[in-house]
Amino acid sequence: MELNGRVALVTGGAGGIGGAVVRRLAKAGVSGVVINYRRSAKEAEALALEIERAGVKSMAIQADIQNDGQVKSMIAKIRADFGRLDILVNNAGVTHWVKVSDLEALTDAIWDEILDVNVKGAFRCARAAAKLLEANSGMIVNVSSISGVLSPSTMSSLAYGTAKAALIHLTKGLAVALAPRVRVNCVAPAFTDTPWMSGHYGEKYEQVIEQASAGYPLQRIAIPDEIAGAILGLITGGDFVTGQTLIVDGGLSLS
């Protein structure tokens, strides 16, 4: 896919992997990029301004992907302001940190939120954007996780791993449902150095990184720009690729 003239939407795009994707797309030549956020208004607006100053039209839109009405309103605003949508990156996600062995702590409320955001949220965005994407032979990239591929030891919770596995399967289903006009692919990143991860581990974060890195053949964890690069590669270099999941894990799944 050539990016000149294209418009992209990145959910959960204010920072971390999402923010890196926004910057990659802007540098690669899209004409417009929309940054979706739920709570990170300051970060999203600052990033939109950064992208505008780089010469690419940008806006930040608040929308909770758990709310179908808000998702539809977001897509309608994109249609009104940009006239098109070519690329959807379903990056928004949520987890709760619950030991895999602690089944009692994994409540129905936790299950419901994790599945609603990580799976149904991606579906809502794809459904709302489908007609715009079909109009210009567009592309969807879903952001899953290595937790949806490997053993429970990689999971923040059993519900999160299950949801990310479901997102991989949703990718296959959407690839069939939206063919031949829209390609749908997925990335499954391993441990990535993001504010989300550092915020969870706090003072122990550097120690956690060191311990985790020892288990990777590349002897380190990922940075957001590396995941964004893989996503960009699927968008620009995979015109005959659909329904696939690219594992971006520094070789972790080999060990």
Regions found by a protein language model. Name each.
Residues 14-15:
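Conserved glycine-rich cofactor-binding loop
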Residues 94-95, 108, 139-166, 171-179, ...:
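Catalytic loop of short-chain dehydrogenase/reductase
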